[in-house]
């Protein structure tokens, strides 16, 4: 993995501006830029509205340091302005580093497994045959006791739900008795072709 190395770029400052007018109004922006143009004539500004930051690029590090000493924590339009030296991030390479080779093999089947790797067999599913047997013996309205009660545990009893066939039949009879709604067709609007009129 590449180590990140933060280097300070002493010819650039980052200004934390609390007043949002710097980003929208040209007069306020001109006042802001004039504060720094006294320290360097060949200066450039980069405005980052969503971060409320302005990057100020000076032509030499001495003028940037002088501007920071004089203007750090000063008021601009009634709000405090803070100045910091800009950090540049050097990763070392412009390409992504490959991941660590801990587990770079497929689980099943492995393309190139490590030494001593063995295929893991799937476990058999757990089936409760007592429960299946009890359900197969039950009929509607009956119950089956899986485990008898003891002094410390309750008994486990399976009840079969009764079917809702009677309710379904009643609902179907009601549907048949209801009259079907009549669908009234709408008339087609009058149409006269343009070339005939």
From Swiss-Prot:
Annotated GO biological process: calcium-mediated signaling; negative regulation of calcineurin-NFAT signaling cascade
Family matches, as Pfam families: Calcipressin (PF04847)
One example GO MF annotation: nucleic acid binding
Post-translational modification: Phosphorylation increases its ability to inhibit calcineurin and decreases protein half-life.
Comp. bias regions, Acidic residues: 163-173
Phosphoserine sites (modified residues): 108, 112, 163
Keyword Cell membrane: no
GO CC entries: cytoplasm; nucleus
Keywords: Phosphoprotein, Stress response
Disordered as annotated region, ranges: 163-197
KW Phosphoprotein (keyword) present: yes
Induction: By oxidative stress.
PANTHER family for this protein: CALCIPRESSIN, CALCIPRESSIN-1
Function: Inhibits calcineurin-dependent transcriptional responses by binding to the catalytic domain of calcineurin A. Could play a role during central nervous system development.
Quaternary structure and partners: Interacts with RAF1, PPP3R1 and PPP3CA.
Similarity annotation: Belongs to the RCAN family.
The name this protein goes by in its record: Calcipressin-1
Organism: Cricetulus griseus (Chinese hamster)
Phylogenetic placement of the source organism: Eukaryota, Metazoa, Chordata, Craniata, Vertebrata
């Amino acid at each position: 993995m590449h180590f990140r190395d933060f280097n300070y770029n002493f010819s650039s400052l980052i200004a934390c501006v609390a007043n949002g007018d710097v980003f929208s109004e040209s007069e306020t922006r001109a006042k802001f830029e004039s504060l720094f143009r006294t320290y360097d004539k060949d200066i450039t500004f980069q405005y980052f509205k969503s971060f409320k930051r302005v990057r100020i690029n000076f032509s030499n590090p001495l003028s940037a340091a002088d501007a920071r000493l004089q203007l750090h924590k000063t008021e601009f339009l009634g709000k405090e302005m803070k100045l910091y030296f800009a950090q540049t991030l050097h990763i070392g390479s412009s390409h992504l580093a490959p991941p660590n080779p801990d587990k770079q093999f497929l689980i099943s089947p492995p393309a190139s497994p490590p030494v001593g790797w063995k295929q893991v067999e799937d476990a058999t599913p757990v089936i409760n045959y007592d429960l299946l047997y009890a359900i197969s013996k039950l009929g509607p309205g009956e119950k089956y006791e899986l485990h008898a009660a003891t002094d410390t545990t309750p008994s486990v009893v399976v009840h079969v739900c009764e079917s809702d066939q009677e309710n379904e039949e009643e609902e179907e009879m009601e549907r048949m008795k209801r009259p079907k709604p009549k669908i009234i067709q709408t008339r087609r609007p009058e149409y006269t072709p343009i070339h005939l009129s």
